[in-house]
């Protein structure tokens, strides 16, 4: 196929018929009847064909009917327990965002502004789940980023532009589809400024990241390398308009309640005539978060320009024990339903008794992990049973009660064969 002789006979040197590169400049040269093509041109042709197929056959109208805020809220109710105010705020913000993308500008030339979202709520309150559920409902690309891994360009860590690269990967580098996507940036509170005062040292993972995110969130043309990097000199960077992408930032904001309390505490002034600030009333975390103002976020460590790019603020409440029990059983993809489906594949029914559900919720409350800690508790309790079940025959039912959750006993196995059940009990 190629001539590897090094006898100085240049007439035998083979070249790609498309890009003109010699056999020594490419990894592979494929021969046809008096024609040759290199591996780089093959890759380029594949990319062109994929794009044409997507444009002709794969193109379908996206979101032919934009769900109303009521429908968005109803869909969120199916998967997320509680957080009614946050759901309403999100439903309106998301509806307005995609309405803006469809309308462009109104007849009188008024350009609609972009409304990105800031979610404030304790760990395990449902911030990530809300964002994921919205993306599924709207059938748009969705990606998550961890703000703690981001640094300014030129420093060790992840550049903010990598967020757009991840979004493109989720939709097979379809720029149009990516520009309708949703990006969720978690742990946004971790990039707060280290202090209120400007520092002489560069804060590359705090204020520096906030500065880097400003343009991306507000709207800019981000240049992203094509799929697999720049394999071919003719390949250009993909241009992505981030003004059409909805950014949702979320964080637990530990300590923000103290900042709010300092601002809202009764009384002010100094001296004999000053009112004493009252601390008699115990204010919950949820009540404090409900009173958050932009000035509190500035004092916490977010720069004013960054807060300005996140005009829609939704606060999530702490989940109590009853809410955690609801999360275990009520959503369409509830945790107990998932494990019951898993056991059903082994031909066994899984039953969680009421006292078991309360014990799981109580344990999660003690760990202060919210809904996020529920899976690890259930997984730990059912580990031995899931290990043994595939090797045991005639098991028709597995029962989990409070004693199992507390580690006092193993889950009860009920067999089709009563004699075997009696033997296991002995």
Curated annotation (Swiss-Prot):
| Example of a GO MF term | ATP hydrolysis activity
The alphabetized UniProt keywords are:
ATP-binding, Chaperone, Metal-binding, Nucleotide-binding, Zinc
Give the source's domain of life in one word. Bacteria
Keyword Chaperone in record? yes
Binding annotation for ATP = 122-129
Task: List the GO cellular component terms.
Answer: HslUV protease complex
Q: Which InterPro entries match?
A: AAA+_ATPase, ATP-dep_Clp_protease_ClpX, ATPase_AAA_core, Clp_ATPase_C, Clp_protease_ATP-bd_su_ClpX, ClpX_bact, P-loop_NTPase, Znf_CppX_C4
Q: Where would I find the ClpX-type ZB domain in this sequence?
A: 4-57
The keyword Chaperone belongs to this UniProt entry's keyword annotation = yes
Q: Name one GO biological process term.
A: cell division
Amino acids binding Zn(2+) = 16, 19, 38, 41
Pfam family name, one = ClpB_D2-small
| Subunit structure as annotated in this protein's UniProt entry | Component of the ClpX-ClpP complex. Forms a hexameric ring that, in the presence of ATP, binds to fourteen ClpP subunits assembled into a disk-like structure with a central cavity, resembling the structure of eukaryotic proteasomes.
Q: Identify its protein family.
A: Belongs to the ClpX chaperone family.
Q: What does this protein do?
A: ATP-dependent specificity component of the Clp protease. It directs the protease to specific substrates. Can perform chaperone functions in the absence of ClpP.
- Write down what this protein is called: ATP-dependent Clp protease ATP-binding subunit ClpX
Biological source species: Tolumonas auensis (strain DSM 9187 / NBRC 110442 / TA 4)
């Amino acid at each position: 196929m190629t001539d590897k002789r090094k006898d100085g006979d240049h007439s035998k040197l083979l070249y790609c018929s498309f890009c003109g590169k010699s056999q020594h400049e490419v990894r592979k040269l494929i021969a046809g009847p008096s024609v040759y093509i290199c591996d780089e041109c093959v890759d380029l042709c594949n990319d062109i064909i994929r794009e044409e197929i997507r444009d002709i056959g794969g193109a379908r109208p996206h979101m032919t009917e934009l769900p109303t805020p009521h429908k968005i809220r109803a869909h969120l109710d199916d998967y997320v327990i509680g957080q009614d105010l946050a759901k309403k705020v999100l439903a309106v913000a998301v509806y307005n965002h995609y309405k803006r993308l469809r309308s462009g500008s109104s007849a009188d030339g008024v350009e609609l502004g972009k409304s990105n979202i800031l979610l404030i709520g304790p760990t395990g309150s449902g911030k990530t789940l809300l964002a994921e559920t919205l993306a599924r409902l709207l059938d748009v690309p969705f990606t998550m980023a961890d703000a703690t891994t981001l640094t300014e360009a030129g420093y060790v860590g992840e550049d903010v532009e990598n967020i757009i690269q991840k979004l493109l990967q989720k939709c097979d580098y379809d720029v149009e589809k990516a520009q309708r996507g949703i990006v969720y940036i978690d742990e946004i509170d971790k990039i707060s400024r280290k202090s209120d005062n400007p520092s002489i040292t560069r804060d590359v993972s705090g204020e520096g990241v906030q500065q880097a995110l400003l343009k991306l969130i507000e709207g800019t043309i981000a240049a992203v390398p094509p799929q697999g990097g720049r394999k071919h000199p003719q390949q250009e960077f993909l241009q992505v308009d981030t003004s059409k992408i909805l950014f949702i930032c979320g964080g637990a904001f530990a300590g923000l309640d103290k900042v709010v309390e300092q601002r809202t505490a009764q009384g002010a002034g100094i001296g004999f005539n000053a009112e004493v600030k009252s601390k008699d009333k115990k204010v919950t975390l949820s009540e404090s978060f409900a009173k958050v103002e932009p000035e509190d976020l500035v004092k916490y460590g977010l720069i004013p320009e960054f807060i300005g790019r996140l005009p829609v603020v939704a606060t999530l409440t702490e989940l109590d024990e009853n809410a955690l029990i609801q999360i275990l059983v009520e959503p369409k993809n509830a945790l107990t339903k998932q494990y019951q489906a898993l056991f059903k594949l082994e031909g066994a029914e899984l039953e969680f008794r009421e006292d078991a559900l309360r014990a799981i919720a109580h344990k999660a409350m003690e760990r202060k992990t919210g809904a996020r800690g529920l899976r690890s508790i259930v997984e730990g309790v059912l580990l031995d049973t899931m290990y043994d079940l595939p090797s045991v025959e005639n098991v028709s039912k597995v029962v989990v009660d409070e004693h199992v959750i507390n580690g006092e006993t193993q889950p009860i196995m009920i067999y089709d064969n009563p004699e075997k059940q009696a033997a296991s009990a002995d």
